Amino acid sequence: RINTIIYIIPFAFLFCYNIVFSQTPSISKKEFYFMKGNIGGSAITMYLYIKGNRITGKYYYDSIKQFIDINGNINGDTFYINEFVNNNKIASLNGKVTENMFFSGDWISSDLNNKHYFNFSRYSSSSISKATIINSSLKIDLEGSGKFDSSRDAVVIENQIKSKVLDKISVDVDGVKSLDENGIADILSKEIIADYNNWKNNLSLETDINVKREIKISYLDDKIISFAINNYSFVGGVHGIDTSVAYIYSISTGNRIGIKLSELISNPSDMDLINLIRNKLLINYSEKDFFDFNAIELSDTFDITPTGIKFIYPVYKIAGYSLGIIEIEFTFSELKPFIKSNSPFFYLFE
């Protein structure tokens, strides 16, 4: 009997320890850099993310302004990056990187027929050239009783100049009332643990939950910064729901802008504009794909891109779930006739 007790107690302790340990969210950080440089003498603008030794992001030639996706690895002072257009690899960049984030090396086309020298570095002239995206996540499988999967991002803008405006943006964009990275991680983790405990206590109602919030910088210049916030929520039922919204801020005031369509468009009911959006929808879809094609108007959710304005239709807004989130982009020249002259975005169309 004594031996049995001796063996049971350590086993029970280990079991309880594993349960507690498994309920501790993991924390990770990803650094965002706003970069400028050139490839073969052609100016580029780059949104670069570094997480550990992993590089992701996108860039565009300033003369073309069409995003090119990138991913690769950094190892000490060397790096290798592949670039893609529509998921097709078109070139690679490899070379050296210094401690102050100056990248240089050779750009080589996939067919090996073209080779150019490149360099890019942090755009120090910008008020915002670096931000940290902090993530807290927790995944638990109760083995037959349900699965819990939650992940949340928050962002803090590097603020060496102690600008109240930049701090205002950092606090507002994710709703986390802290500027300290450890404090932010703690807040995110407490929110996730609270959700977990609520889920665990209601397993009879829902067996699985999957909730995610991802934040990316979708556009940045000297006047505005836009964050794309993508959410996914599954709390039972047939399927989960994706949402995408842009949080756009004035860098001079820290105020959020672009909340209403009236801040951008002079007359959202203009039939020329409405017909234009419907024609764009028909490029990839047919009229029967929508609930009521002739009732479709301009979405009041939009984001900025290097080439124009992207309008975002949430799931179920104009079509069924299978079509997902629908995004339609206008070039600046296409949309210019419909822009308010006093819009905070008017400078983009000049």
Predicted regions and their residues:
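Bacterial N-terminal signal peptides that target proteins for export
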Residues: R1-I9
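Bacterial N-terminal signal peptides
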Residues: I8-Y17
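Sec/Tat signal peptide C-region and signal peptidase I cleavage site
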Residues: N18-S22
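Edge beta-strand at a domain terminus
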Residues: Q23-K29, D62-T78, D106-S137, D242-I251
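Central antiparallel beta-sheet cores of small beta-barrel/beta-sandwich binding domains
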Residues: T24-E99, S104-W107
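Short aromatic loop motif centered on NTY/YTY
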Residues: S92-N94, L261-I328, K336-E350
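Acidic/His-rich structured neighborhood in mature extracellular/periplasmic domains
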Residues: N198-N255, I259-L264
